[in-house]
C-alpha cells in the first residue's frame, strides 16, 4: 500500500501569477497573459520569471493537477502525481496565444516570435489634471485570439499551404519600365493576407470566420499622476491587438496638455502674468490668485517696495508637484507689467514732481536750443511697421525682376 503524500507548499504558484486560491480559469488566463507578455525574453523580460509563470499556469489551468497541488502541494506533482509542469515555457506561451507548439520544426525556443505593433493614443489633459492628478476611463476595441479555435481559424485546427504564394506569405510582381528594364516588387499575398496559409471554407471557425481573431471592447483606466509632463507616455503592456504567433504589443497613451488661459508651465515651475497700475507699482498692491487646485493665494508687495515693469517675483513651493515626489513643488513666478496713464494734466505733473526723485535730464541754454532742430514723436506699433516694410520690400523686388525681364525681351527684338 502506498502512504499518503506528505503535504508541501501549495501557495507558491498562486503567488507567482498574482491571484487568489479561489481564482477562476478566466482569472488565471488574464493573469498569465499579462505577466507572460511583460516577462517574455523577446521583450527584455526575465527568462527565469517567464519559466516560473509557465510552470504555474500549466499546473493551475489543469483541473486535475490543480486539485493535487491544492491538496498536497508542489512536491506531490514532482513525485509524479498527475504529472509535473515540465513543458517548454515558450511552447506554453505560443499555445496560449494561438500558435502551434509542435509544428514548424520543433520547439519554439529556436524560433523568435514577431512582436506586434504598439497602439498609440493621444490623451488630452488640462493643466489642472497634471497638477492635481486624475483618472480617465477609456473604452477601446481591439483584436483578441479567438477562444473557440484558439487562433487557428479552423474547426479541425488544420490549415493548407496557400497556393498563391506557396506558403511564403509574399508575392513578387514584375513591372516593365522600358526596353531591357524591369522593376521587381514584393508585397503581401492577397489570397492569404500574408499568413502563408488558407483554410477550407467548410472548416472555418464559426466564431471568427477563419480570421483567427475577434473584436473585443475593453475599458482601460488611465491614471494621470501629479506632476506628469506634456508628451509623457502611460503604457499598458500587452493590451494592443493580439495575433497568432505574435508577442502582443502595448497600448501607449501620450499626454497632450491643453493650453491654460492663466498659467504657463516650464518644467516644474509655473508662470503667471499680472498687470499693475502705476499707483500699485509705486505705492503697493495686493490681489488674490486662484491656484490650479482652487486655493486662494493672497499676493501682496512689501511696504515701500516699488515693482518695475517686466520684473519677476517668485513664490517657493507653489509651482507644479514633482512627478512621483508629490510633496515637493517647483516655484510660481509672477511676471509684472505696469500700465501707465495715457496723459497727465499740469497739476498732476506738479504734484508728482513734489514726491518723485528730481529730473536727471540736462537743462539746455537758449543758445544750445537755438542750434537744435526740433522733432515730433508719434506713436507706432513696431511689429506692424516691420511687417509693412517687409511686404513693401518683397513687392519692390518682384517688380524689379519682372521689369528686368521685359527690358531684356525688348532688346532681343
Curated annotation (Swiss-Prot):
Residue ranges of the propeptide: 411-413
Record Pfam families: DnaJ (PF00226), DnaJ_C (PF01556), DnaJ_CXXCXGXG (PF00684)
Cysteine methyl ester modified-residue sites: 410
One GO CC annotation: plasma membrane
GO BP terms in the entry: protein folding; response to heat
Topology with respect to the bilayer: Lipid-anchor
Locations listed in the record: Cell membrane
CXXCXGXG motif repeat residue intervals: 146-153, 162-169, 189-196, 205-212
Main location: membrane
GO molecular function, one term: ATP binding
Region annotation (Disordered) ranges: 387-413
Zn-finger region bounds: CR-type: 133-217
Occurrences of domain J (ranges): 10-75
Lipidation (S-farnesyl cysteine): 410
Induction section of the entry: By heat shock; weakly.
Domain of life (superkingdom): Eukaryota
UniProt keyword annotations, A-Z: Cell membrane, Chaperone, Lipoprotein, Membrane, Metal-binding, Methylation, Prenylation, Repeat, Stress response, Zinc, Zinc-finger
Tissue specificity field: Expressed in seedlings in all tissues, but exceedingly high levels in hypocotyledons and roots.
HAMAP family recorded: DnaJ
Protein role: Plays a continuous role in plant development probably in the structural organization of compartments.
Name of the featured protein: DnaJ protein homolog
Source organism per UniProt: Cucumis sativus (Cucumber)
Gene this chain is encoded by: DNAJ1
